[in-house]
Amino acid sequence: MGLVIKAALGALVVLLIGVLAKTKNYYIAGLIPLFPTFALIAHYIVASERGIEALRATIIFSMWSIIPYFVYLVSLWYFTGMMRLPAAFVGSVACWGISAWVLIICWIKLH
């Protein structure tokens, strides 16, 4: 898949999030990043370059990768109640990074 197509898909997702954030159903903008646009691209690339077995391993790892995203959401919810938004974002991204790092270390040790 060409780089231009990937960039166009990403731009469309960002535009859709921006439009939805301005509607009365603004919370739907939080659902859009969970649409597997980038997962589809990643899975296609892995399958075409490394084969189905690598794709299946990537799918299992992707299932586990929900944990760092959940950590990000919980920490962002918590931090927005006690600090300014920029600091809450930084703290939440740090929590995501730590939990993603732990996930990768565990995955490497177990596989």
Curated annotation (Swiss-Prot):
Its main location: membrane. Residues 1-26, 80-87 are cytoplasmic. InterPro entries: GlpM/YdgC. It is a multi-pass membrane protein. One of its GO terms (cellular component) is plasma membrane. Keywords: Cell inner membrane, Cell membrane, Membrane, Transmembrane, Transmembrane helix. The keyword Ribosomal protein does not apply. It is found in: Cell inner membrane. Residues 48-58, 109-111 are periplasmic. Disulfide bonds: none annotated. The chain crosses the membrane at residues 27-47, 59-79, 88-108. To P.aeruginosa GlpM. This is Inner membrane protein YdgC. It comes from Escherichia coli (strain K12). The lineage of its organism: Bacteria, Pseudomonadati, Pseudomonadota, Gammaproteobacteria, Enterobacterales. The gene is ydgC.
